[in-house]
């Protein structure tokens, strides 16, 4: 736990109290993702020294864009914050966080239409792209809400509908990996970003918890195994973002943390813990090869250290939390 706490402390070094964001110049959604990493750490470890960050961040950020309530110009940005609110509920038991998450789900659902047979649009209000991440996040959010609201049927119905659409969309390719999205309503062959392989795992765990349909876990395990054994995404057994090789943009350094967070959810849900050794190997490599010596970690988990920022550090916190 000491290494995870040190990584959290280093991540908090990027937090700006005046704006309620981690590195305000970075993409807004990454503060929602960093908040989730912090909440996951607190929930797993029982260490709540930074609990004050939750309400401080939420009360500022929920009013920042558009009409408030974490609305943005893309549905995935809203979904990251909504899922963090689900985790805030798990940690505190306070229903107001679920209320925020429900507001997010309803807003995202407003961008579902019949184009390509269903699915939510990524970009709003333009509506030019239906992609994997927005629909994976929406699915996970719907199923998570159902599982936390006794007597619910509406979120479950929407979750099942979303999964049926996603499963039929063609975004899951023949290699068992998820491509980025659709072009003319067919798989666009886009990059297999690690977070697209991850969020769907957590979504299917939540949906299996709701339905008991073992076919869902079979799909999740197929994607997880394809990712963890891929020479493209896990060369030498260490998770690697495709863009690491050419220089990652501002978003990509967050992706591996999102993958391992959701892989851990699957691993802890399945009795035999099939991905425990993989997660342990990632953490060992991170600690040995990716640090600057001050508990800050770069994007290359196999090394060498490149630089420190919120996205890289939140991914490290995600990873070290999985092995607590």
Spell out what each predicted region is:
Residues 52-144, 157-160:
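Extended ligand-binding groove/face enriched in aromatic
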Residues 92-95, 145-154, 207-214:
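Inter-helical turn/loop segments and adjacent helix faces that build the functional surface
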Residues 135, 142-146, 154-207:
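Active-site cradle of extracellular carbohydrate-active enzymes
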Residues 63-67, 110-115, 168-173, 229-234:
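Secretory-pathway/luminal and periplasmic proteins that interact with or process carbohydrate-rich
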Residues 196-211, 215-232:
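Oxyanion-binding "anion nests"
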Residues 1-37, 41-80, 88-92, 97, ...:
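CBM-like carbohydrate-recognition segments
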Residues 10, 56, 60, 103-107, ...:
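The canonical alpha-helical register within tetratricopeptide repeats
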